[in-house]
Amino acid sequence: MPGRVARVTEVIAGSPNNFQEAIKLAFDRANQTLRNITGMKIVDMSVMCEAGQIQEYRVRAEVIFVLE
């Protein structure tokens, strides 16, 4: 029975609107380059603030994909 080997790579993305958009941007960008993505784990969520206002929503994610 053959097994599978996966790899994990980290991506960071930001959005001025919300975390959901930042997550989608991270996934969409990873999906342009990586094949066989099987999952994505959000490792960290943070915001960048300036003058008492949120300027950017940021996510750090691990993208899991199966090696060919």
Question: At which residue positions do the language-model features occur?
Answer:
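Amphipathic alpha-helical hairpins
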Residues: 2-5, 9-11, 46, 52-55
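Short, well-ordered alpha-helical segments
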Residues: 3-39
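Charge-dense, low-complexity polyampholytic segments
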Residues: 35-49
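A cross-kingdom feature marking charged/low-complexity
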Residues: 45-68
